Curated annotation (Swiss-Prot):
The chain crosses the membrane at residues 20-41. One of its GO terms (cellular component) is bacterial-type flagellum stator complex. Each stator complex is composed of 4 MotA and 2 MotB subunits. 2 A subunits and 1 B subunit are thought to form a single ion channel, so that each stator complex contains two channels. Coiled coil: none annotated. The gene is motB. Disulfide bonds: none annotated. This is Motility protein B. Residues 81-102 have a biased composition (Basic and acidic residues). Belongs to the MotB family.
Amino acid sequence: MARKKKKKHEDEHVDESWLVPYADILTLLLALFIVLYASSSIDAAKFQMLSKSFNEVFTGGTGVLDYSSVTPPENESDGIDEVKKEKEEKEKNKKEKEKAADQEELENVKSQVEKFIKDKKLEHQLETKMTSEGLLITIKDSIFFDSGKATIRKEDVPLAKEISNLLVINPPRNIIISGHTDNMPIKNSEFQSNWHLSVMRAVNFMGLLIENPKLDAKVFSAKGYGEYKPVASNKTAEGRSKNRRVEVLILPRGAAETNEK
């Protein structure tokens, strides 16, 4: 009887040798990602050292990381600077245009005041001057006040109201009213000093101006300087006459209300 051969069943063997290089590749990729991530938060010197170490460990020599830099490329840095420069230039041009428009508006107000002075034949009582602080309108005290008094004469109230119309500007500007005197001691019981007199003249004149419903009282302020800001010598009658005055300063837009003359 023939002997029945026993069937051999051999287990199939799967070749897994590819796993070793695959694992090495994953390790290298992980190391590369770690380096790239770390490079964003370390300085250039440390990055070069770390790069060199990884290249020596994994490749045994010079690699692509040896001469990399964490600083932005030169052309990228230039682009950022160019954008910043362009923005600053636009801002500068905008401010220059606003300043030019502001100056033009003040010049227009000055022209209107000068026309008013000419029409009213007040060349010896009022004058205008453009200064670095704004448009200055100077009014001699004799046009509104009696000597040593701070109340505007009744007959001159209409003139003060006409002047108020010249100050109607849209949008409103800050306006400072200041009183000034000569250095002659005041000789009445109403005021303790020239300083007190100058303050009250400024306040009373300002009060008449802001009775104009077209003017905003919030943009007005009053000051008194007494004899301490003369524009002429107090040694002559003519000089003292020039020093006795009320000034209206129309400020540039954006100027502080506390702007000192």
